[in-house]
Design a protein with these regions (language model features):
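Feature of Fe-S/electron-transfer and energy-metabolism proteins
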Residues: 1-351
């Protein structure tokens, strides 16, 4: 368990060394699209073949550094039409439309050897693209919120912390005043991810000034539009980043309870969020007296029932309360009387923080 900032930094450095000792990494996309295409079968098949070949294999980041090949189930790479996807590091090779029968060749050429399987690379206009970053689909993208998706084990808190995770929470707790946090979010220009585009900093400011003792932070992960998978990709691919953003919102506003409202039709997102919350609680990063700061924060998941209208704020809070998900007349707004009639920060943009 991590009790304070010193232990958080020690944990980070320890597992960072373990990551650096892994001389090759196999990242198999475990987003919903690739899983539907059989990516988990590919993961198990290639891992089995590698073990049978007598090569050192790990599926979990160990405390002590070991030279080994790491097998990881990553979040969504975003290139779903070409799935199942598999990435080999440190080379950055991305294999597309991989099948279980391709695993023998991947083992021989890319794991035992140091060359790509050219037929599995992405091809366009007669050219093969070895590095993922050079593929036209990715080349002009600058990933900010999705920076970890496709590059890390979505379920490993050790890897998240090793890459700097929960350092922002430590900074908010010990190096910043609550007003400074709110002002920084306002200065960033961050807005909601829905159609209204309401400034996130103003929501934090309005909830922070409320005199109520009990306040809430609610993440709206309910996207009802057919074919809209923005929220799902974030929750599946980098759940700890969502948790950390909600915690910072809690620090800024004086809220100690959070809810993630997620569609029940996203079972993988629900599973990964549950795993992430349990891991954070086990390490002492959720619960009472986080990092010996005196700040408490708990987080719960509420699964929606598929109602499109529950994407609207007041309908969403009604659904969490166990009532029929119906919008109410405003004012009062959720920042004044939201969940259980208490001031509530309701947003998905908190993950950007």
């Amino acid at each position: 368990m991590i009790h304070n900032v010193r232990e958080l930094n020690k944990f980070k450095n320890q597992y960072k060394k373990s990551m650096e000792a892994q001389y090759k990494k196999v990242l198999v996309c475990a987003g919903t699209g690739c899983v539907a295409g059989g990516s988990l079968e590919i993961f198990e098949r290639l891992k089995q073949l590698t073990e049978e070949a007598g090569m050192p294999v790990s599926v979990e980041l160990k405390k002590e550094p070991h030279e080994e090949i790491a097998f990881k189930k990553s979040g969504c790479h975003g290139f779903c039409e070409m799935g199942p996807l598999l990435r080999i590091e440190p080379f950055g090779w991305l294999y597309v439309k991989v099948k279980p029968e391709d695993c023998e060749e991947i083992l021989e050429k890319s794991l035992k050897g140091d060359e790509p399987v050219e037929r599995l690379l992405f091809h366009q206009d007669g050219k093969a693209y070895a590095a993922e970053e050079e593929i036209p689909f990715y080349k002009k993208q600058t990933r900010i919120v999705l920076s970890n998706c496709g590059h890390t084990d979505a379920e490993a808190i050790e890897e998240y912390i090793a890459r700097g995770g929960y350092q922002a929470v430590a900074k908010a707790l010990f190096d910043m005043k609550t007003d400074d946090i709110v002002q920084e979010v306002m200065d960033s220009g961050l807005r909601g991810r829905g159609g209204g585009g309401f400034p996130t900093g103003r929501k934090l400011q309005q909830v922070a000034k409320q005199k109520e003792v009990r306040k809430f932070v609610v993440c709206n992960g309910d996207e009802g539009d057919p074919g809209a998978f923005m929220d799902r990709s974030i929750m599946e691919g980098d759940p700890h980043k969502m948790i950390e953003g909600m915690m910072i919102a809690g620090i800024a506003t004086g809220a100690h309870e959070g809810y993630i409202y997620v569609r029940a039709e996203y079972p993988l997102a629900v599973k990964r969020l549950q795993t992430a919350i349990a891991a954070a609680e086990k390490q002492g990063l959720l619960g009472d007296n986080i990092l010996d700061s005196g700040f408490d924060f708990t987080l719960r998941i509420n699964q929606g029932a598929g109602a499109f209208v529950c994407g609207e704020g007041s309908a969403l809070t009604a659904s969490i309360e166990g009532n029929r998900g119906m919008p109410r007349v405003k004012p009062p707004r959720t920042v004044e009387q939201g969940l259980f009639g208490k001031p509530t920060v309701l947003s998905l943009s908190l993950i950007h923080i």
